[in-house]
Amino acid sequence: MTAIYSNAKNWLVQADLLAKSGLTDLIAGKDSGAGYGKAIIGDFSIMMPAAYSLVRNRNIMHHETISKDGAWVRYVDGTRLDLKDVQFFWGSAALAQSDHTLLHEDKAKKAELALESILADLAVLNIPDGVKLSISLSNHNPERWADEIKRRVEGTHTFEHLHPVTRSIVTKTVEIVVTGIYPEGFGSIAHCLFGEASLVLDPSELAIALDIGSSTWLITVFNGSGAVIDRHLIEGGAGELHSMIAEALDKRNDKVSLLSKDVKHSPSLVNQGIIEGTFTYGGNHLTGKKFETEYSQCLDQWWSNRIEKFANFVTAGNYLDRAKYLVAWGGGVSLPVVDQNLADLGCVILNNPQFINALGLKLLTQISIGA
């Protein structure tokens, strides 16, 4: 059973377990995502912000870092000779740098930085040295990027990272085999039909899936054979909601102190307050402020606009009447109120919805290697 962790204590326990596991082969699925990358590696899961920052000044000291959602990595040697001695930050460690790249702002980066993303995952999970990793990946345009991704990712790679428990720098070598590169959402369908979720759907029957991600709502109509019948993209996922709330906070006239005067509120801190369930912006008494009211107001506007577009698409195509299931996944379906709204519509909300595509991609890896 795949372990889904959500706090640092569990992460450290799992990082220690995996390092001492003696495993030599790992099967994985990686969903590069928009705001967050998600991966299932062996029986472990990981989710990190899809952000990258190159270490330009190699003379700086003590910059190495690691946490449950970010890491410093140095590529030592291996198949990617162009990366030899390159150091970079990934995830929250990259967001902490002033000159970071967000992958959703340039979709080409999802392909160009595919290896760096995987190495950061392996660092945070603290894999044993000498592992062979078989992995399936997703991409928004496999026809354009599949060969490039495979060229960049496959091979033997030696890298350094900070050990999560001992906090010393360790060196690991991994052999990576890419078993498949699939369109976005393909893994989710595989998980629904052939994985743990197992929707009972005949080849002639339809299901409508709604994937609420960081950047978009993606509607996919598929049949019991796994074939995609139709797709429709609605711009403005959960990240848009976070931005709306941040802008609403900008307009509030309740300055707590001179230090918080004219502050520009961060969507990522809004998201943090939602995830923690506190609906509080900021982590200290100088900036901390409740935003339940802004959440409720912005959510109504965000939801009503997009659910109307969803309804228009599924009814115009005559899919709604024919669908046996409405199913929802993606990190956005777990948002407070959104989960209830979807349930009221009769949607099946899958467990661990943000990991559905990665779980399905891992399943596709298992099928491809006969595991």
Give the positions of each predicted feature.
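Aspartyl protease active-site motif detector
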Residues: 31-33, 209-211, 220, 239
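Nucleotide/phosphate-binding catalytic cleft detector across ATP-hydrolyzing
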Residues: 1-207, 227-234, 277-371
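Short beta-strand scaffold segments in enzyme catalytic cores
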Residues: 37-41, 217-222
